[in-house]
């Protein structure tokens, strides 16, 4: 963030540091008074060791920009440089460089919500906000957009399955939380495939962590399941959460065990303002080329940029970054 702050200051842009922990905000005033527009980039990396020999390889062991946030920063820094040298425009541009888009450390605040809480959309008050996300799945130099719901909401869930420990040779003397967990995992998938009308909006339940046991011949006392829910409809999300609790508790009870379900909502649905998007499409087509601006479908990835859109009009688009010479998609240690 200090590199960004110094770059903005070198351009004559007024800079505020440490917004939302380590965020940077720059303000550039145009020639005349007018609307205030915010441009936002995320900054955080992922806990992945970079495995390539590129000249922009991470210099920090175990951490890399595997999700493209380094390109977001570079693009916004270049935009600030261009506008600072050609500030013959009406209004004010606010450059927002935000940390913790991937989520703050457990038990801490951060990301877009904390930036908003600390007044990033005030002084001066922002009229509209714009952002982008690069995609390694989409063709390079193409811009993809969609009005209304664009990216999904994200919720993190944990299911603690409690049984009764026993020896692997005498499983009838205990309650096996691994068997219970396997039934819960399968049942959650039927919420999506058999109970959700996916012709309206997509939804996903994915497990990322299964933890349990410490020896091959001992059935553990408990198993922890951790995963994510993605949805583009709040009613559907609420239904999915309700059914997850009902199924987990019911299945565990039927086997003589217990299931404790905890669900924490993360990013909201990224909702692109249709009217503002319609106003901005001519500019996008003018800069990227008419045939390079493409209406696309919604995605089940999530972005805490959604919290800005809960406060003011704005939109986010995707920028294609697929390299036909590299058969990797983000996040990848070779990306």
Where are these regions (language model features)?
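Acidic/His- and Gly-rich active-site-bordering loop/insert found
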Residues: 1-65, 74-90
């Amino acid at each position: 963030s200090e590199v960004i702050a110094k770059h903005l200051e070198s351009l004559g842009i007024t800079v505020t540091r440490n917004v939302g922990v380590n965020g940077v905000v720059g303000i550039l005033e145009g020639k005349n008074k007018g609307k205030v527009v915010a441009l936002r980039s995320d900054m955080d990396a992922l806990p992945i060791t970079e495995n390539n020999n590129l000249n922009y390889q991470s210099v920090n062991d175990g951490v890399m920009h595997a999700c493209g946030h380094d390109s977001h920063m570079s693009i916004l820094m270049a935009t600030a440089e261009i506008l600072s040298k050609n500030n013959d425009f009406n209004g004010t541009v606010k450059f927002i460089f935000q940390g913790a888009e991937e989520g703050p450390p457990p038990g801490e605040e951060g990301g877009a919500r904390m930036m908003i809480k600390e007044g990033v959309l005030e002084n001066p008050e922002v009229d509209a906000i714009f952002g982008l996300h690069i995609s390694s799945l989409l063709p390079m130099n193409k811009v993809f957009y969609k009005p209304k719901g664009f990216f999904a909401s994200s919720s993190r869930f944990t299911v603690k399955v409690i049984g009764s420990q026993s020896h692997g040779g005498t499983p009838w003397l205990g309650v096996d939380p691994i068997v219970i967990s396997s039934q819960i995992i399968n049942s959650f998938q039927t919420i999506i495939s058999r109970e959700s009308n996916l012709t309206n909006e997509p939804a996903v339940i994915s497990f990322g962590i299964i933890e349990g046991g410490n020896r091959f011949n001992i059935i553990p006392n408990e198993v922890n399941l951790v995963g994510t829910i993605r949805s583009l409809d709040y009613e559907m999300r609420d239904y999915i959460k309700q059914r997850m609790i009902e199924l987990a508790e019911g299945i565990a009870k039927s086997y003589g065990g217990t299931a404790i379900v905890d669900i924490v909502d993360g990013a909201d649905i990224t909702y692109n303002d249709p009217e503002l998007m319609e106003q901005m499409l001519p500019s996008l087509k003018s800069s990227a080329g008419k045939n390079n601006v493409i209406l696309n479908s919604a995605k089940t990835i999530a972005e805490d940029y959604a919290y800005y859109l809960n406060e003011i009009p704005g939109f986010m688009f995707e920028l294609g970054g697929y390299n036909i010479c590299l058969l990797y998609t983000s996040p990848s240690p070779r990306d």
